[in-house]
Structure formats: C-alpha cells, structure tokens
Amino acid sequence: MFKKLLLCTLLAASGIAMAAPANPHQPSYGTWQSRDKSKSITLSSKGLNIVVNAPASCKRRNQWGQVISWVSGKQLRSDINESLELNDQLADDKGSYRAEMAAVLPKIRDNARYFKILGYLSCSDGASGLIQIDANTALLIEIAPDEFYTVVRKRKP
C-alpha cells in the first residue's frame, strides 16, 4: 500500500512539473524590440522564440536549451561595464553603445534582482536572451563568446 501511495504521489508531482511553463515569469511575456527595430525577441510561457521556433535540426538531443536565472544589479552593472571596456577595444563606433548603456545604467539598482533568460541552439555559435530591467525596459543579451547588450522596449500589442 505504501509503495502504491508513493508511486501515485511521484506520478502526480512529475505531471505537475511537466505541465509547468518553460518560462514562468509572466511579466516578461511579449515582444521586445530595439529603438531602431533592427533587433527583437519574443518571450512566452514556452520561453524564447529563438528556441521554441527553431528548426528540428537545431534541437538535437542535449544540444539546445533555455536557462532561467536571476542576476543581481551589482553583477549586471559589472557585466555591462566589462562589455563597455571590450566594446571600446573592438568597435569603431564606441560612442553609440556607450550612450545606450549610459541610458539604462541608472535604472539598475545594486540590491535588486533581475530576471534573465538565455537560449542556445546546436546550430548557432553562442546564446541570446533577455534581462528584464522593468515592466517596459530590458536588455537583449548576445553572447558569442563575449557579452553585448541592446536596450529593448516592450512592444504594445
């Protein structure tokens, strides 16, 4: 009897876990777009559109995924400053990236935690994702292998 009860409990728990959304953070749902509309990313309960809508050839077993985490404001500031230094070394147009990041840095509080979702595929070189700053502002993150950010805003439906 105990074994049957344990089995039923485990099956029920696994069913609940399998029904859980890949992205449980509802405030992040929607399409996020850069000011010039050159970059965008869409999130839903299934996760990032770049992963959800990828062709099957890009989703080979154990070679794709989504990682959801929370990053501290202090760590995010540090990561942005590191990307600014790298951009200064690599880019011809240093001013526009620096200005874009300068506009978002005041919104980041050191003691706050920010929602972060990254997706990667076997057919791409790196990862993409989103870090939500507030209800309407986020950073599109592109890693290949260095991290660079684009300020994106939530598009109205």
Give residue spans per PLM region:
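Short, hydrophobic/aromatic-rich segments at coil-to-beta transitions
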Residues: 26-31, 49, 110-119, 136-139
